[in-house]
Design a protein with these regions (language model features):
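Protein kinase glycine-rich loop
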Residues: 38-49
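Conserved N-lobe loop of protein kinases adjacent to the ATP-binding glycine-rich P-loop
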Residues: 53-60
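Conserved alphaC helix of the protein kinase catalytic domain
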Residues: 39, 85-88
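Conserved N-lobe motifs of Hanks-type protein kinase catalytic domains
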Residues: 44, 90-93
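Cytosolic eukaryotic protein kinase-like domains
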Residues: 1-29, 60-85, 96-143, 176-310
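Protein kinase catalytic-loop region centered on the HRD/HxD motif
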Residues: 147-160
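Conserved beta3 strand of the Hanks-type protein kinase catalytic N-lobe
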Residues: 52-53, 65
Length: 310
């Protein structure tokens, strides 16, 4: 029922339940008072997320599948198994950790590490949160997501495509480090397969080619990453700007025109240079032609070279 036997009990107190799924189940149900809404911290299309604190252990985020009187819907089961399949294959500091899962008719849920600051989307929507996300922090958020995607695309065999990179699926820790979450529609690319699928993801982040082809590739994530980077720079979704880019022959946009005006302009030349590079990378990731978009490995390499040169 639980995974990650390699982690020591001192590092992960949740592991004490590895061999006793019934105890784990009972403790979570008890701590959440049978998943009372007062512990709910988020609602998605297929699940609710609860903040659950187990006595003597740490705080966890528990994602509970929605169910009906007929049981769990087929689509929800698919999302559940997708998430388990993806997260049991990967380990990266910028990808949220799955500690365990339970699949039962009454309650089916996944147990993750809890991210104290919630989603990047919520932080950017809040005046106070946006100001707390200063320019240096935003640079680190972008790098964290880039490293996670590069790992998934280039270091996992076979590669894993997230398919729903958006600000609501980037979670922030207490020190505002970025973690990629929600692998419910992730796809593991199978060799010698067409990897065709139905369109899925968050409107406003979907690669344009998905309107005429069902083939999922790394380039779909890269387009979504481009949208996300502009959103981090601007402090809001860059919908109108992207539309203008697709219909314009020029991709030259002054940096000052895309920076969140809730923050004071950056004064450090190092930060200015990093923000300018991120703007440039985001525009290349948003190319209408998938083959023209860079790989995530290339994106990370350029970010690292910029940091080294400063």
């Amino acid at each position: 029922m639980l995974k990650d036997e390699s982690t020591s009990k001192s590092e992960n107190p949740f592991l004490i339940w590895y061999f006793d799924g019934e105890t784990m189940f009972e403790d979570i149900v008890e701590a959440s008072e049978n998943f009372d809404d007062k512990y709910c911290i988020g609602v998605g299309g297929t699940a609710k997320v609860y903040k659950v604190e187990i006595p003597g252990a740490q705080v966890f985020a528990v994602k509970k599948l929605r169910s009906t009187v007929e049981g769990i819907e087929t689509e929800n089961i698919k999302s559940f198994t997708n998430e388990v399949a993806a997260l049991t294959k990967i380990r990266h500091r910028n990808i949220v950790k799955l500690f365990g899962f339970c699949f039962q008719e009454e309650h089916s849920f996944l147990v993750y590490e809890f991210m104290e600051r919630g989603s990047l989307a919520d932080m950017l929507c809040s005046e106070e949160g946006a100001k707390e996300l200063d320019w240096a922090t935003r640079v680190q958020v972008v790098k964290g997501v880039a490293y996670a995607l590069s790992y998934m695309h280039c270091d996992c065999v076979p590669p894993i495509i997230h398919r729903d990179i958006s600000s609501k699926n980037i979670l922030l820790s207490s020190d505002l480090e970025a973690y990629v979450s929600d692998f419910g529609i992730a796809k593991i690319l199978k060799p010698n397969s067409s990897n065709w699928t139905t369109i899925a993801g968050t409107y406003g982040y979907l690669a344009p080619e998905l309107t005429y082809t069902m083939a999922v590739t790394e380039k779909c994530d890269i387009y979504s990453f481009g949208v996300l980077v502009l959103e981090v720079l601007m402090g809001k979704h860059p919908g109108e700007l992207i539309t203008n880019l697709h219909y314009s022959t020029s991709t030259s946009i002054p940096l000052k025109d895309v920076l969140d005006d809730r923050l004071s302009p950056p004064t450090s030349q190092k930060i200015v240079d990093e923000l300018a590079l991120m703007q440039s990378l985001s525009l290349s990731c948003l190319s209408a032609a998938p083959q023209s978009r860079p790989t995530m490995r290339s994106v990370c390499r350029q970010l690292e070279m910029q940091a080294a040169n400063n």
